[in-house]
Regions:
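Amphipathic alpha-helical hairpins
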Residues: 21-158
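Short, Lys/Arg-enriched N-terminal segments with co-localized hydrophobic residues
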Residues: 1-21
Length: 158
């Protein structure tokens, strides 16, 4: 019995050549408090955060299925921590209109650190576990996006 890969690489599934883009940018740009002025680096960080959270959760689950699961305990913990931080950061950032920019900046910086920690751990297992390699790469992408977005935010003083 042939097993179909339900998680094909993006663009490689002939039935779904490309995933539709997230609708975050159009949604935020229509917000009455934003009026079309969108921080593109923040949008990239939001999308990267949601994507990284999913990849980290999948990696943690894949690690749990490995025979040597005890050797992957720290990797699993960091995957789950990273996923939670990414979700919290993205969730806060999508509500950025009228919110605390200083807090968003700190969350983005924290998310970048969580992603860096997770990537370092995943890279230790990357040669033996493909899911750890993929996760580490996704964490690095999210880390970069969060650092770029954090640098773009200049909180106003009240």
């Amino acid at each position: 019995v042939a097993v179909r890969n339900i998680f094909p690489a993006p663009g490689l599934d002939p039935d779904h050549p490309r995933e539709p883009p997230m609708q975050i940018q159009p949604m935020i740009s229509t917000h009455p408090d934003v009026r079309g002025s969108v921080n593109d680096s923040l949008i990239r960080a939001i999308e990267a955060g949601y994507g990284c959270a999913a990849v980290c959760r999948i990696c943690a689950d894949a690690c749990l299925a490995e025979e040597m699961v005890r050797d992957l305990t720290q990797c699993i913990r960091l995957d789950l921590d990273c996923a939670d931080v990414c979700l919290a950061t993205a969730g806060l950032a999508v509500r950025r209109a009228g919110s605390n920019e200083a807090l968003i900046k700190r969350m983005l910086e924290t998310c970048a650190e969580a992603c860096a920690d997770c990537a370092i751990e995943g890279e230790k297992h990357a040669e033996m576990h493909e899911h750890c390699r993929i996760c580490a790469e996704e964490c690095r992408r999210c880390e970069d996006a969060c650092r770029e977005a954090a640098a773009s935010i200049r909180p106003s003083r009240h």
